[in-house]
């Protein structure tokens, strides 16, 4: 049985003297409805008190006791035996029962169960000396506070004399046995084993019995063998005076009430957490049990575990587990009662949260037209229709009904439709790319035209770009701006571009998503850049005329002719008109296309025309000269094994009696305006000094007839150069020449036929010993040929020089 309005009053009695409260020692007030002449019905029960010498006590001792703090309420005494009398203070627990008409109030009979409590702060009459008995002359202190039970104003029907109630009262986490029988209140402390955790307190009926109404004598010691006689007092009924003003409680008694110090309001039994340094209180016992789980050894123990396999959820209460099981069963028993909603939820809490949305629905009302909206944002959007000006400009696209205030706003809106239709398309032949903005199309067109207006101004850089954004991105390299850091711990790498960081992050995943597309190659890579480097190995196996740049000093490979032309425009600054002439001239091919296929031998007349025929039109000469100057055309002839026609009479020590190797014209790296070439004979013992071949003397160059050479200067022992004509005689020093062929007038000449050769035959390459090798090379402006290498390869022993 629980009495919710029964509150403890706590005090401490100091000193070694008497301990009890004398009969009539404390004033109490009668309820307003109690008749004055009724027999005494109040009972003042002191459940615990000093057991050191009886009820008598001096006034000065009581006054001293009221000022000192004491141990906690109902705490088991360890420093003093229950029957001992010595010094020291002890706690007492005071209960004042005031039933109406001598009967016990009954719970559930129309009013709240239990008496209404009121705080008492008056001093009652005390005792003089050490004798017991009432002495109305001198007041004495009754402890820090008393509680008087005041009956409710309305009369309450009471049960008959034979009615009895029994139960347990828990006050500050301490259990007390309680029993009402025939108007008698019985309270007792459970046996010592009942305080153990989990043990239910045993009821002891009839432990402490107060005298019946109308008998103001104290209870006999034999009535309750467990408590001494000074713990039970009877008080006769007295007229209740007006309550005195409340005094502020001293010591720990002020912290007993649920609302701070004990007040006049109804009290609630609180359950205090027994753990040290916690101090939390709870209104219900099960709340305390849930709280105690947090103090268990496993910190947050959850004894209720979901029984379904693979779930693993645990909970502190069985209700939460039950609510969790509904989620497994897909049960949603709590449906929304709103009309047209139809939503259901697993818990009532979720339903209540959902219902708040219905309560706020259409709670925002427009002050102009009284229309309601569910949110403030929608209301604000609606209110603009009342206060904004007219919007005469409407979008003309089908399905779009938006209107605008100004024409510029309409045009800005139309760009959104243009982006959807992708109206900005590239007009370059063969390109079908489309863009949502004209500026992006303009940047794309620069990739076709080769225009790169944004130049890097860093010293020695020279890079240029099609857009400012790419230039700014490039400048991060110069500033070492590596703003994109790898987030993986221990990596520490940083990058200038976000896409580089994205590609690097794949390496931390341990996967290789980039696969080589070449059939039969199963290579995989974790980075796209590694795949690109690997793919170059496969490109070296394809025909080089389709992929290699025709510029002799450039070894870049390309997958299409279009990309190769784009490269020539961007890197080598070749104009579009020159590219068109290059495509139109079928005889002009890159140097890499010159293969080992030999042509038919020519007659003497054709050899003569090689040096004498000059074309009527100068267009071919201009084209060939432009190609040579730009470095596009490089003619590498591997060998020429021919004899020159005509009789060459001996001059001085020169004779034609011995065969000589044909001359070899090697390419150098000087600018094409003054082509420095070296004429070598096929033996290591004989060579000719380096001389200059002027571009003005070259009329036409082609693979077929090789054009016409106006003159080839010849230098003998005399410093005066003389022209080389078809009838001129070529005199060489035959003493140091190794015979390989005979120079006679009836010999048959061969065309300067091409053979397989490297891209650039450098003067230091090993061509000595290759019989019949003659190479013509026109260098480009990008190369550079050192004089040291030339002197190492040339040995001057002859007396004749070919200039």
Curated annotation (Swiss-Prot):
PROSITE patterns assigned: ZINC_FINGER_C2H2_1, ZINC_FINGER_C2H2_2
Subcellular location: Nucleus
Biased composition (Gly residues): 13-26
GO terms for MF: transcription coregulator activity; zinc ion binding
Tissue: May be expressed in brain, heart, kidney, liver, lung, muscle and placenta.
Required for interaction with ZXDC: region residues: 271-577
SUPFAM superfamilies: beta-beta-alpha zinc fingers
InterPro entries tied to this protein: Zinc_finger_trans_reg, Znf_C2H2_sf, Znf_C2H2_type
Alphabetical UniProt keywords: Activator, Metal-binding, Nucleus, Repeat, Transcription, Transcription regulation, Zinc, Zinc-finger
First and last residues of each zinc finger (C2H2-type): 271-295, 304-328, 334-358, 364-386, 393-417, 424-448, 454-478, 484-508, 514-538, 547-572
GO cellular component terms given for this protein: nucleus
Source organism, top-level taxon: Eukaryota
Stretches for region Disordered: 1-91, 120-140, 218-260
GO BP annotation list: regulation of transcription by RNA polymerase II
Region (Required for transcriptional activation): 576-703
Assembly and binders: Self-associates. Interacts with ZXDC and CIITA.
Family named by the database record: Belongs to the ZXD family.
Function noted in UniProt: Cooperates with CIITA to promote transcription of MHC class I and MHC class II genes.
Protein name: Zinc finger X-linked protein ZXDB
Native source species: Homo sapiens (Human)
Underlying gene: ZXDB
